């Protein structure tokens, strides 16, 4: 425990010294301690994995859904037919915000077969207070995000939940899954035919072998 505390102190100090102009001190510290957060929570995350083991198919097509991208332009999900899609609810001030870096690496590694899509949301402890313009700038400057981002919306179950997360968490639409996001950076994988196949909690890193195996599965 003493070694962990010392390491934590070093990381925090380094984060303060190396703070970027476009990052708050909180954001800089969270980015620095992200590896420690993942180390401490990863084992629990594997208990929360969900998989479409029975091959359930949706009664409502995912490709019929539309939303606005973060720049307010219409985004048509039908254009993604034939590729896997990883949907992630995101936030800029979360302990898991460091996953942006891994998500971008994942997108680049599998760009011919996968599209990562971020859904900024302020649903958990007010950790995404910025507007769409600020969120887009933060992601680009600090993590080099090139994958699509949707406009800021609500991802948890209520009457304002965005249509995509309504589909992801309603078994009457997707065929089997009723799991809403429990925190920022929960991940849903949709296959090339528009079938929801996996749910990964925030405690599973985007580059975890479990995620990679699901993406590479034929």
Residue ranges and their predicted role:
Residues 1-62:
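N-terminal targeting signals for export/organelle localization
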Residues 163-166, 170-218:
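Thiol-/selenol-based redox modules, centered on thioredoxin-like
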Residues 75-98, 103, 116-120:
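Short active-site neighborhood of thiol/selenol oxidoreductases, capturing the structured segment around
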Residues 81-85, 111-115, 143-148, 192-195:
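Loop/turn elements at helix/coil->beta-strand transitions in domains of secreted/extracellular proteins
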Residues 89, 113-130, 145-158:
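Thiol-based oxidoreductase modules, predominantly thioredoxin-like and allied folds used
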């Amino acid at each position: 425990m003493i070694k962990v505390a010392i390491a934590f102190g070093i990381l925090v100090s380094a984060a303060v010294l190396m703070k970027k102009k476009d990052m708050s001190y909180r954001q800089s510290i969270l980015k620095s301690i992200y590896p420690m957060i993942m180390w401490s929570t990863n084992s629990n995350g594997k208990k929360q994995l969900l998989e479409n083991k029975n091959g359930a198919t949706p009664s409502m097509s995912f490709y019929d859904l539309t939303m606005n991208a973060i720049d307010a332009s219409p985004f048509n999900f039908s254009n993604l037919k034939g590729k896997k899609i990883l949907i992630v609810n995101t936030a800029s001030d979360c302990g898991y915000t460091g996953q942006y870096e891994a998500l971008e690496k994942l997108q680049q590694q599998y760009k011919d077969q996968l599209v990562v899509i971020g859904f900024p949301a302020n649903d958990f402890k007010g950790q995404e207070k910025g507007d769409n313009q600020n969120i887009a700038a933060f992601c680009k400057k600090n993590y080099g995000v090139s994958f699509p981002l949707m406009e800021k919306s609500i991802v948890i179950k209520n009457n304002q939940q965005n249509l995509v997360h309504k589909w992801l968490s309603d078994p009457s639409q997707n065929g089997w899954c009723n799991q809403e996001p429990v925190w920022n950076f929960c991940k849903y994988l949709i296959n090339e035919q528009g079938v929801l196949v996996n749910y990964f909690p925030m405690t599973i890193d985007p580059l975890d072998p479990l995620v990679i195996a699901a993406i590479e599965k034929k």
